[in-house]
């Protein structure tokens, strides 16, 4: 999966989960996103570093990576990212739809 698509999907799931008492982190599991656990952990760490999410604990050990998403949440900056990129997503879907209909594009 494209890196930015994965980031967008994570943020979108967290935004949708704001209406729930507890976020189900299985919605953004590496298997769901189609990425390795290591890449997924790096996505979460980077997103936390830039302020899009908070509440994530990432620990790297010799045996692998451990990620605690119990308190994961989207931040205001993460919501702004979603808002700014929603137009890009709409354009992408429109282009993809045209490409599916018109052969050779």
Region annotations inferred by a language model:
Residues 3-32:
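Short amphipathic alpha-helical interface segments
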Residues 11-17, 47, 82-85:
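Generic structural signal for hydrophobic core residues of well-folded globular domains
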Residues 21, 51-55, 85, 89:
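Amphipathic alpha-helical interaction segments
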Residues 25-30, 59-65:
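Short, surface-exposed loop/turn segments at secondary-structure junctions
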Residues 33-56, 69:
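Short amphipathic alpha-helical interaction segments
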Residues 62-97:
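Short, amphipathic alpha-helical interaction segments positioned at domain boundaries
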Residues 98-105:
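Short acidic DE-rich linear segments
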């Amino acid at each position: 999966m494209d890196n930015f698509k994965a980031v967008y999907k994570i943020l979108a799931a967290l935004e949708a989960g704001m209406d729930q008492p507890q976020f189900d982190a299985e919605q953004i599991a590496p298997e769901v996103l189609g990425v390795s656990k290591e890449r997924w952990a790096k996505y979460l760490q980077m997103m936390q570093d830039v302020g899009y999410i908070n509440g994530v604990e990432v620990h790297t050990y010799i045996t692998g990576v451990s990620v605690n998403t119990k308190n994961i949440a989207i931040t205001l900056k993460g919501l702004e990212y979603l808002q700014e990129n929603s137009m890009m997503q709409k354009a992408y879907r429109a282009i993809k739809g045209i490409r599916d209909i018109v052969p050779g594009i």
